[in-house]
From Swiss-Prot:
Name used for this protein in its record: Protein Nef
Disulfides per UniProt: none
Localization terms from the record: Host cell membrane
Function in brief: Seems to play a role in optimizing the host cell environment for viral replication without causing cell death by apoptosis. Enhances virus infectivity and pathogenicity. Probably involved in viral immune evasion mechanisms.
Notes on the domains: The N-terminal domain is composed of the N-myristoyl glycine and of a cluster of positively charged amino acids. It is required for inner plasma membrane targeting of Nef.
Annotated organism of origin: Simian immunodeficiency virus (isolate K78)
């Protein structure tokens, strides 16, 4: 599936994986020079993947970027606040990071079942999302990329709430999110912390799980999200309001559901 599509779009799809992998790299490149002396040597092979713009010397101040390592131990509450802060500070760089045209190249259109399947296989054939850590920023990059390159309105990407495997709510999208284990040593190691975004994605997740994209063809035939968690679809599930609330409460999701509109 997707043979003709692959020939037509081979270059853009290959670029998408690199853009996602660099989603945190640019931020890291900016702060490394101030965190350690001789940062170019410490980066090793990773430095080759960073643009010259991202590696230019810029003064780093504590708290300027989220998820940067600290030299002095902090209280757990302070660590949590520090790691979660300033996500908005990098929003303005998203367009530049994605590197796509400002305006969509094709007319805007809604994501459909067939289009979701085509895009899923096309991305898979080009190396796509497999094994890439999920984060709120990478979520936005994928939305922006498909909007600008394919004209897909960015209202389609949604997953079940967890905890555990997050199934796509868009029927036909074949990329789910699976929890992955990151060792305690890796989470505490500053070098690993700089190079891997696993420590950043857990703060994007209300359950504190580290998630990665994984291809799964099953949702092409079975609406896994709806079958497993109909309560997350609200009135569209066919369940009574009382049953929806009961199920959400049992899963610890009622407070989250109250904060956003039930779909």
């Amino acid at each position: 599936m997707g043979g003709a599509i692959s020939m037509r779009r081979s270059k853009p799809a290959g670029d998408l994986r690199q853009k996602l992998l660099r989603a945190r790299g640019e931020t890291y490149g900016r702060l490394l020079g101030e965190v350690e002396d001789g940062s170019s040597q410490s980066l090793g092979g990773l430095g080759k993947g960073l643009s010259s713009r991202s590696c230019e010397g810029q003064k780093y101040n504590q708290g300027q970027y989220m998820n940067t390592p600290w030299r002095n131990p902090a209280e757990e509450k302070e660590k949590l606040a520090y790691r979660k802060q300033n996500m908005d500070d990098i929003d303005e760089e998203d367009d530049d990071l994605v590197g796509v045209s400002v305006r969509p190249k094709v007319p805007l259109r809604a994501m459909t079942y067939k289009l979701a399947i085509d895009m899923s296989h096309f991305i898979k054939e080009k190396g796509g999302l497999e094994g890439i850590y999920y984060s709120a920023r990478r979520h936005r990059i994928l939305d922006m990329y498909l909007e600008k390159e394919e004209g897909i309105i960015p209202d389609w990407q949604d997953y079940t709430s967890g905890p555990g495997i997050r199934y796509p709510k868009t029927f036909g999208w074949l990329w789910k999110l699976v929890p992955v284990n990151v060792s305690d040593e890796a989470q505490e190691d500053e070098r690993h912390y700089l190079m891997q975004p696993a420590q950043t994605s857990k703060w994007d997740d209300p359950w504190g799980e580290v998630l990665a994209w994984k291809f799964d063809p099953t949702p092409a035939y079975t609406y896994e999200a709806y079958v497993r968690y109909p309560e997350e679809f609200g009135s569209k599930s066919g369940l009574s309001e009382e049953e929806v609330r009961r199920r959400l409460t049992a899963r610890g999701l009622l407070n989250m559901a109250d904060k956003k509109e039930t779909r």
